[in-house]
């Protein structure tokens, strides 16, 4: 957290604001947060903040996973054709790769790549990417919220079990605005136990385990909660049975650790490998 313009106030005010922000973050579940008091005009704290951000950028990215990129823009360039942009959530992509474009449900070949405004031969998770793609799709058929994927996906999810991190308590079957990557839809929440809930989506989403979502009130004025995907397409009945809830709690606890998550899925049934 960067506290800006600290040269404009007394040191006591800086500490007061820091304590307020720290308390708010603690209530939201962020217990260990780095604070950087800064004053750009005086070059105070800038070097420390820059060093911290560079360290964050060097953290390992999920490049061994399948490539997933959420599209937020599509346009045409004279002499090149269709170009789409978005942020890669996982995996990596190279010029010449063939990716699956949802929405039009067709394969597209990557003819060119730009990452962070530079022409590159490959790009990876965490980067903003522009892809010049070639295939049986026109710009008018490509929409914000479509995905480029390394392989044809299973059907999008209409219902999903999530782990909630609430800023404001939610009520049973409350209507919500739901944000996921570049998608914005509506749906309802069915509370299960503790911080577990089922989201029933008005429009299916291309989700994966551990994806993050933002939940806002139906007037779209207030952010109510964050959510993390625990499992997709839950059973329509029996979600409140003790054994199923126990399984969900165990699955939520392992987070993004693939090996124990796979073991838990195998305890219940076969695993779909698409």
Predicted regions located by residue number:
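A secondary-structure boundary/capping signal
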Residues: 4-5, 89, 201
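Conserved catalytic-core segments of large NTP-driven translation/proteostasis enzymes
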Residues: 23-168
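Short, contiguous clusters of charged residues that form electrostatic/catalytic patches at enzyme active sites
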Residues: 19, 51, 69, 260, ...
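Conserved C-terminal guanine-recognition region of P-loop GTPase G domains, centered on the G4
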Residues: 1-31
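Short acidic, glycine/serine/threonine-rich loops at helix termini
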Residues: 11-15, 47-50, 83, 225-226
């Amino acid at each position: 957290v960067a506290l800006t313009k600290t040269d404009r106030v007394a040191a006591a005010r800086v500490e007061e604001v820091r304590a307020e922000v720290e308390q708010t973050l603690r209530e939201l579940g962020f217990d260990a947060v780095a604070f950087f008091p800064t004053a750009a005009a005086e070059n105070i704290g800038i070097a420390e903040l820059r060093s911290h951000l560079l360290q964050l950028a060097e953290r390992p990215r999920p490049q061994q996973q399948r490539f997933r990129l959420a599209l937020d823009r599509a346009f045409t360039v004279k002499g090149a054709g269709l170009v789409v942009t978005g942020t890669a959530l996982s995996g990596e992509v190279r010029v010449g790769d063939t990716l699956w474009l949802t929405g039009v449900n067709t394969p597209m070949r990557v003819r060119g790549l730009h990452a962070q405004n530079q022409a590159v031969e490959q790009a990876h998770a965490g980067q903003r990417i522009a892809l010049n793609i070639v295939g049986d799709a026109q710009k008018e058929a490509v929409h914000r919220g479509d995905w480029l994927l390394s392989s044809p996906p299973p059907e999008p999810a209409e219902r999903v079990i999530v782990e909630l991190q609430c800023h404001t308590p939610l009520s049973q079957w409350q209507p919500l605005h739901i944000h996921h990557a570049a998608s914005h839809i509506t749906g309802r929440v069915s509370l299960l136990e503790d911080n577990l809930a089922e989201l029933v989506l008005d429009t299916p989403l291309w989700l994966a385990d551990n994806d993050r979502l933002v939940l806002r009130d139906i007037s779209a004025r207030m952010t109510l909660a964050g959510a993390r995907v625990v499992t997709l397409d839950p059973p329509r009945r029996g979600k409140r049975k003790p054994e199923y809830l126990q399984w969900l709690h165990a699955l939520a606890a392992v987070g993004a650790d693939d090996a124990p998550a796979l073991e838990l899925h195998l305890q219940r049934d076969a695993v779909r490998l698409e």
